[in-house]
Amino acid sequence: MKWWRVLVLFIATQQICIAQKNVLLHIIKGDSLDVKYHKLFEHPDKYHFQVIYTEITRDSNNVAHLKKHYLYPPNNKYYYPASLVKLPLVALALEKIDSLHKIYGITKDTRLRVDSAYKCQTCEVNDSTSESNYPTIGNYIKRMLLVSDNYAYSRIYEFLTPRYINRRLHELGYKDAEVNQRFNAHCDSTSNRYTNPFTFLANDTTVLYRQPADSNMEDISNVAENTKLGKGWVEDKQIKPARDFRHNNYMPFKNENDILLSIVFPHDFPPAHRFKLSKEDYEFLYTYMGMLPRESSHPHYKQKDYPDNLKKYIYFGTTDSINDVSVRSMNIVGRAYGFLADCTYMIDTVSHAEFCLSVLLYLNEKNLLNDGKYQYYEIGLPFMRDLGHAVMDYEREKKRKYQPDLNKVEHLWDAK
């Protein structure tokens, strides 16, 4: 064989090996996404660009074996997680309810009352979105997972308290996680240390459990790198100095991806790193993580006000109406100040393709925060749509020794 043929064969073999080692990059290049979205790939630091793709291989017992592929090495550079923190909080809320159930008999559907004990706190005795017309932990969780409801998040934050949230996340192995704020512009960092009293009720007069007001005087600064974001902060039409997010919520993006995996595939994690949830808890989470807003009866959402893609970025992008519900995204998203993120477990119930994909982007060309001028629709959502389709196509064509049994989730989105 001539030398040049040997060289060509060697180069081709090396390229195949590289593609096999970096499946994610192989998928991206195969669909020319690195060309179409070249700015992201040329300046990954500028765009806080992170992608984590998890391949799922089933064995003969349908047990999932996970293999993660990173586009870039994980880092602790600060990004604003926004609503991504809702996923660990809904799991922690169910954990806490289960522990209280053993003593007081309360459940996620038990009626509750929220009182106030410090500035910026508000009371709540009724909830018109709930089937019972009363507030419940379960209904707050539904609102968070269906439409990323910030008010409901703040109530779950108050129920859990920041001390409990961070202690428990650290116990689970997420040592750099720091959740220390409501999503309420009227509450400053001091007010967020104080949480409301909660009362759980069997009826108008019978109290099952009282949770007193709480305060947390521990250090709430996060450990992220470079917590000053942007070149300025826009407020009252004026550009003010860059804001320091040292006392805001933070969770490494890798941790957020792992939390999703631990909820979808708990048995792939050691017991010490799993949420202590029941089978019913997991099914409840899967149902409302994958449901479209219009599919929910309680709470009820009109599609014209809450489009299908409200919190479905990967694969669906800017598609307001999703017609093919055989493809489901069980996910959590974040969007604020130019940051756009989605962490999802995706399934196709027809082809039985499944995978997890997490994407983080910073889309703020002016690098001014709080001016509302971000490139979500020009770059972010189209990229997440295209990458989602590229990975789904790859998974649909993949030869599998054992097909995943998706029966445990296929029935979850019947009318609720």
State where each predicted segment sits.
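Active-site-adjacent helix/loop patches that line small-molecule binding or acyl-intermediate pockets
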Residues: 21-33, 46, 116, 121-124, ...
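A short, well-structured edge-of-sheet supersecondary motif
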Residues: 31-73, 357-359
